[in-house]
């Protein structure tokens, strides 16, 4: 095991231990939760190393980066999570690689995703903006 991979394994293990501790404190089991490893600005080779360490859920918040990485890593058993604001015009493309989209914030985006041809249904999570900051993503609570 390389030094960098050892460090990566140690960091992943520390995160998993923290999740297990928090789950226990909340009266839950860690295996009830899903760890989504976000690899923003890191190469696809890092995702490949993470899979070797047992990671299967990967998150990205930039469409182009997610699209490229998912295309490069089709040989791996991964679940791709899109966690960034998604432009309606890119929704159909995202639907081709994303297993889950965590930033649904408007009806037009739902319609665009619904019209995409996908082999597996996409898990969709509505993002709500609870702040007064219009620059933040998410639907208004009244919507």
Role assignments for model-derived ranges:
Residues 1-143:
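Conserved alpha/beta-domain cores
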